[in-house]
């Protein structure tokens, strides 16, 4: 009651002529403030309906009254007029003789002057009872809807949920109604559409219509949505009498699509009965469901749909939704076909596809892309979202009206996999939103052999979607027309509100997990029922025949026509001799490769820049390009330091990155940097987004003020997610080769939170799916006494997954050896020791004639190290990325005197040079830095080893022996020198944890391996 009184008081100046829009704009503020302008001085028990959930209803009635006093029942008109006039407690139900303010004091003390209307009290209570009843159906109707085609479902129902809402007259008492009220006519509230054009209905008819709307084959979950307009929109779609009607032509189209879906699976079963195909039997309605969503979206202007789905029904979707040539699908079953493309390939039910065709319903062009995915369920979700975001970005689709995504899920995975939650929480973030995804859950009520009761703690597998206020439409999959209607509404919702929506197809799985599996072991009763279940095609065909929509011969002709199509495609499939995986590309890059998919050249131009370009970028990077913009004093000092560096023709790490990004923007290359806290940088070194200290939320991105016609620069702090965000950025990088897409981990240690994306997509993606990707991973790494969780990006894991052979020396005389190496590798792994080399490797990533993932172990302490500087001279035209940086000190002047050649990578180089100088051993010990670890620079390291004929070889690293680079580098160095010498080790001892958390222990370990590195007798005892 306090809630309503507060709202009424705040809104008292409004008149009935003011619009609902004005009311709704002011209402949230009123609700938030809870500041009473007027309140009753006495208890208000006389108006109990103002408390609890009824207050929401009263607010909605008040909203309608403000717009038009005649739109509500007379009793409400009296109540609102009296309340606005300041009536005392208990008298708001009554009509005062005068509503003038001069009489208010008299009203409070002269009750006898007020005309009594005792029946109004009863009227209000009755109408509130009806409102409670309607609201009960809207909130809980889905719990008693007939959703299970098998009729045995109880796993989705919480035991506390009543078996029905109204099934017997004694339940009416719960709502304050009685059996005698069934034929009484009640005025309908504004929060329901069951009346159609009728403002009032008998209670019996109200209940019947609510049962039809909410308790049949569709269950609607939406009352948790905190937006009145959206709730009203959904109510109108499901409550309006007769709204779910289909024309005969629509029914025939639906039948034809069911024929294709069903007969495709039956054809595969006949031809390859012993092959795994993860068929769609039991949910054949999925195909017409998807086609309906696509049809509706196409009609609303969408011309590109990007899809992601698991293995279940994938071949059917490829054949009947995306329209992949059937012979290309059938030949995948031929075990004798040889693979024409390099790489491992993948199972047929993992492959993706890209196809442009005419939508026959809308007669509009539409592009369909199904993203390839691994068996790791739901892992493709953020990838699809990222690709969708990229396609929207490149075509200027800022509202998602042209490009959209559809994600398919299994019930067990949707509830069980955390990546679903991570992906949902990207859905409305400014730099990640795709303006609404349609989620379709194939809910066959079982996960392999696990019952829902053991697979989730929530009533439905879709409950995770509630966190983003996505409406959830549950539907019985054996009612094809109900499914089609729900899919139409889902597509309309996405087009109207640009928010996520979930369609839960409650179905069953006619076979086991795969066609070779026996489900009766674990679900005997369920599968006894399934064996009796008539296929949905047969049931729907019988229905249409009985309705006279089609006749039996027409139905049989439709079946034979599609069977003939399959047989002809099967015959053509036998002519296929070679299996081309490249025909299954999900993200082609037109114009980037030659027609046969090869790079247009095998060279890489210089990655250096003209000096005036470097100066210009440096000037912008060290200034604020916006007037009247106040920055933090500490940031002013950082920008001053940058200006001094530019004046001295030098760059540090942050400035080198700035120049790499800025120069690519000048060349029309979009740069996108994403990750946790990347705008400022975890180590406060980047500052790509400046914040006005006097105006809240006013920001400036200087990088977008470099050139008049530059490409846009996107830098965005991500949600605190690695798995979801890295998957998203991988998908973004799939869309175009002409973009530098980078994901930075807050610390490299946290990359294993995204291990699935790294292991299943980035590392083997090209081998499995012939799909290149140029994503860049920036992984802060370095042993600096910060403990086991802030020290190691686990380089040993990335290096272990490199695909080169450590025991085979490649042909070092091959033309363009370094470029060919890059082309053949599965990813590039670097650990730069200078800002200049970091600058070059970022630019090389785009200037290469192909794309490979780039893994960069970035430094922490080197960000401000006084020796970690690069002169402009090393960044000018003609300069390149240095795969190896050789010794250039006294040792290189007289190499025959060198007794030990130390190989290292990254930050440890600065520890080694400091120690070498302290020991005065600059002529005896040479230090060579390996900047590119994979592909391994055999050619350059052979020259280094040959340069120092009298030196023993050692690898030095700051990581523990069983971690870091040693196990990767040692066999390759040995192969390089034809095993002529041993390669000794100087570094930390093996350990389980990546680093110690004790500063003293850290320094002790550091000094110990430095002693080993410069003790020229250290390895003699092993010789």
From Swiss-Prot:
Cofactor: thiamine diphosphate; Mg(2+)
PTM annotation (N6-acetyllysine): residues: 401, 970
Residues at which Ca(2+) binds: 143, 156, 158
InterPro entries the record matches: 2-oxogl_dehyd_N, 2oxoglutarate_DH_E1, DH_E1, KGD_C_sf, ODO-1/KGD_C, THDP-binding, Transketolase-like_Pyr-bd
Swiss-Prot/TrEMBL keywords: Acetylation, Calcium, Glycolysis, Isopeptide bond, Magnesium, Metal-binding, Mitochondrion, Nucleus, Oxidoreductase, Phosphoprotein, Thiamine pyrophosphate, Transit peptide, Ubl conjugation
Record: transit peptide: 1-40
Gene3D superfamilies: 3.40.50.12470, 3.40.50.970, Multifunctional 2-oxoglutarate metabolism enzyme, C-terminal domain, TPP helical domain
GO molecular function term, any single one: protein-folding chaperone binding
GO process terms (BP): 2-oxoglutarate metabolic process; cerebellar cortex development; generation of precursor metabolites and energy; glycolytic process; hippocampus development; NADH metabolic process; olfactory bulb mitral cell layer development; pyramidal neuron development
Activity regulation info: Calcium ions and ADP stimulate, whereas ATP and NADH reduce catalytic activity.
Superkingdom to which the source organism belongs: Eukaryota
Annotated positions binding Mg(2+): 411, 444, 446
PTM annotation (N6-succinyllysine): residues: 74, 564
Further information: The mitochondrial 2-oxoglutarate and 2-oxoadipate dehydrogenase complexes (OGDHC and OADHC, respectively) share their E2 (DLST) and E3 (dihydrolipoyl dehydrogenase or DLD) components, but the E1 component is specific to each complex (E1o and E1a (DHTK1), respectively).
Subunit structure: Homodimer. The 2-oxoglutarate dehydrogenase complex is composed of OGDH (2-oxoglutarate dehydrogenase; E1), DLST (dihydrolipoamide succinyltransferase; E2), DLD (dihydrolipoamide dehydrogenase; E3) and the assembly factor KGD4. It contains multiple copies of the three enzymatic components (E1, E2 and E3). In the nucleus, the 2-oxoglutarate dehydrogenase complex associates with KAT2A. Interacts with ABHD11; this interaction maintains the functional lipoylation of the 2-oxoglutarate dehydrogenase complex.
Similarity comment: family membership: Belongs to the alpha-ketoglutarate dehydrogenase family.
Chain's role: 2-oxoglutarate dehydrogenase (E1o) component of the 2-oxoglutarate dehydrogenase complex (OGDHC). Participates in the first step, rate limiting for the overall conversion of 2-oxoglutarate to succinyl-CoA and CO(2) catalyzed by the whole OGDHC. Catalyzes the irreversible decarboxylation of 2-oxoglutarate (alpha-ketoglutarate) via the thiamine diphosphate (ThDP) cofactor and subsequent transfer of the decarboxylated acyl intermediate on an oxidized dihydrolipoyl group that is covalently amidated to the E2 enzyme (dihydrolipoyllysine-residue succinyltransferase or DLST).
The protein, known as: 2-oxoglutarate dehydrogenase complex component E1
Lineage, broadest ranks: Eukaryota, Metazoa, Chordata, Craniata, Vertebrata
